[in-house]
Amino acid sequence: MNLVSEKEFLDLPLVSVAEIVRCRGPKVSVFPFDGTRRWFHLECNPQYDDYQQAALRQSIRILKMLFEHGIETVISPIFSDDLLDRGDRYIVQALEGMALLANDEEILSFYKEHEVHVLFYGDYKKRLPSTAQGAAVVKSFDDLTISTSSNTEHRLCFGVFGNDAAESVAQFSISWNETHGKPPTRREIIEGYYGEYVDKADMFIGFGRFSTFDFPLLSSGKTSLYFTVAPSYYMTETTLRRILYDHIYLRHFRPKPDYSAMSADQLNVLRNRYRAQPDRVFGVGCVHDGIWFAEG
């Protein structure tokens, strides 16, 4: 692989970056939209602006950016069990936001324009139908998956209660064994959970605290983890390209170093780098006004 500098990569035309990404990865990226209400209160006027519409526009902007940079499949967790602790009012607002994903004209046009097949995963079919509003959302999800099934350029998997797949996988495996007389393969389990087979995640782009979540069965030791300092809606093309550059050129496609073949000078540089910062830890943070920030 010809190694270009980060500056050269940042300056490449979009079509060139997309070609590199399609050829060399990443194919599957996890991008949860996190810190969205914080962004809204900082960048919008809560008295006049509508949170749902503002969030939807930003989500479309970022999804468009990811797809236009050559990423084929985006996994986007949008609602987890822990959000239930925020109360009934938040849940109602969340349901309204979820409904927009399947009904809003702007995002439907986005799916069509970018040839996006939309799928939903998680325990939403068990958890949402307890109310009429929730049942309507589930139906709209199913209808959207069917109506976009002919789109083959990109895939977008929204996670709703997708934090733990253990029970779903167990029930699916029992049913599969009863029907086919044998346990399902890994591929069949993933198809059953996500609606289609999805490769293991190449990278996860989170915000704030260093933790991954809500993409069951797809994590591996080769999943590159990235965490932005600012909430997800602050994502820029420069930020994304820096992440792509690191993933493609710096992490996985270089030969493993042979320490026995290193010169004394090379070993000294490495030793001095480690000795200069033995107490530095990525993931350690501080709290200001009740908000956690990364340090290090």
Curated annotation (Swiss-Prot):
InterPro entries per the UniProt record, alphabetical: UPP_synth-like_sf (IPR036424)
Q: How does it assemble?
A: Homodimer.
* Disulfides per UniProt: none
**Annotated control of activity:** Inhibited by the bisphosphonate inhibitor BPH-629.
According to the record, mutating residue 82 to N results in: Significant decrease in phosphatase activity. Loss of phosphatase activity
Query: What name is this protein filed under?
Result: Tuberculosinyl adenosine transferase
Further comment found in the protein's record? 1-TbAd is highly prevalent among patient-derived M.tuberculosis strains, where it is among the most abundant lipids produced.
Q: Which reaction does it catalyse?
A: tuberculosinyl diphosphate + adenosine + H(+) = 1-tuberculosinyladenosine + diphosphate; tuberculosinyl diphosphate + H2O = tuberculosinol + diphosphate; tuberculosinyl diphosphate + H2O = (13R)-edaxadiene + diphosphate; tuberculosinyl diphosphate + H2O = (13S)-edaxadiene + diphosphate
Keywords carried by this UniProt record: Transferase, Virulence
Q: What happens when the gene is disrupted?
A: Deletion of the gene abolishes 1-TbAd biosynthesis and decreases the formation of swollen phagosomes.
How does its activity hinge on pH? Optimum pH is 7. It is active in a pH range of 5.5-9.0.
Known EC number: 2.5.1.153
Temperature notes read: Optimum temperature is 45 degrees Celsius. No activity is detected above 50 degrees Celsius.
- Molecular function (Gene Ontology), one example: phosphatase activity
The entry sums up its family as follows: Belongs to the diterpene synthase family.
